[in-house]
Amino acid sequence: MKIYSAVFIGGALGACLRYGLNLWIHTGQFPAATWLENAAGSLLLGILTGFFMIGAKRPLLSAFLGTGFCGGFTTMSTFSKETVMLLQGQPSLALLYVAASLISGIIFALIGVFVGRRIAGIQQRKGLQEK
């Protein structure tokens, strides 16, 4: 039951932050807020993945931050809706949006995994030195 609560609370916090960013970031025709949310979420999820690959396994924290927060913060449905809206009048901008979203998401996830693994490795070395 704790895992479900962690996912629920993390998801609520992530969704609230996403909503706040959408209110704060108003751009022209390019949906910058959704792009930023998905790129930042990919980076954070990459960091968590890399960290938990090497570091201590923390299922509650992983559920809260990964499934919950990142799941609530990022949004595939809004990305899809915005792409369809752009396709109606600006197909070239829609193509740019899709390409930028996919490429940056993958790149940020890779960077995140690298950073997370480095953090976990540093923590492991500190733990060994203290013993």
UniProtKB/Swiss-Prot annotation:
This is Fluoride-specific ion channel FluC 2. One of its GO terms (biological process) is fluoride transmembrane transport. PANTHER family: FLUORIDE EXPORT PROTEIN 1-RELATED, FLUORIDE-SPECIFIC ION CHANNEL FLUC 2. Na(+) binds at residues 71, 74. Keywords: Cell membrane, Ion channel, Ion transport, Membrane, Metal-binding, Sodium, Transmembrane, Transmembrane helix, Transport. It is found in: Cell membrane. It comes from the Bacteria. Fluoride-specific ion channel. Important for reducing fluoride concentration in the cell, thus reducing its toxicity. GO terms for cellular component: plasma membrane. The chain crosses the membrane at residues 5-25, 35-55, 59-79, 95-115. Pfam families: CRCB (PF02537). InterPro entries: FluC. It catalyses: fluoride(in) = fluoride(out). Its main location: membrane. It comes from Bacillus subtilis (strain 168).
